[in-house]
Amino acid sequence: AIMNAMGSDYIREVNVVKSARVGYSKMLLGVYAYFIEHKQRNTLIWLPTDGDAENFMKTHVEPTIRDIPSLLALAPWYGKKHRDNTLTMKRFTNGRGFWCLGGKAAKNYREKSVDVAGYDELAAFDEDIEQEGSPTFLGDKRIEGSVWPKSIRGSTPKVRGTCQIERAASESPLFMRFH
């Protein structure tokens, strides 16, 4: 049900309040692979820091491309030094891009026009990015021109009352609980 919501064109915003180690990052990557290969959408994911984003690209994204034949077929650059294969961006032969950026700098929320914006470990992001706004406020601006805009946020909650994923979920019109 969670991945169905993430992949549905009829649901614009998905907030996943989760416990630790439930596989949210893997679900997010699976849905992103679907968006890139099947729905041909540009995607972007933010992690709390540039280091987190770089590590995520190396340890999660690159093995995902390697292990999914339909994605690997769109990545002739895989395993090679190439302008379409960097630590912040992967450009596929279908013209679609995948960006993975840190969430601390306001510049990382500019210039990209994507269809899907994702946030992994939203509770670990700064509440205000360089006095320009919250990560979701800045990031969701990137999907405003999309025909099928999608914002997917997920995190294990931190301090009650100050947690961004808790706030995002409380602002949602619907709340589903899975036991």
Protein language model features and the residues they cover:
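Phosphate/NTP-binding elements of NTP-utilizing enzymes
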Residues: 1-179
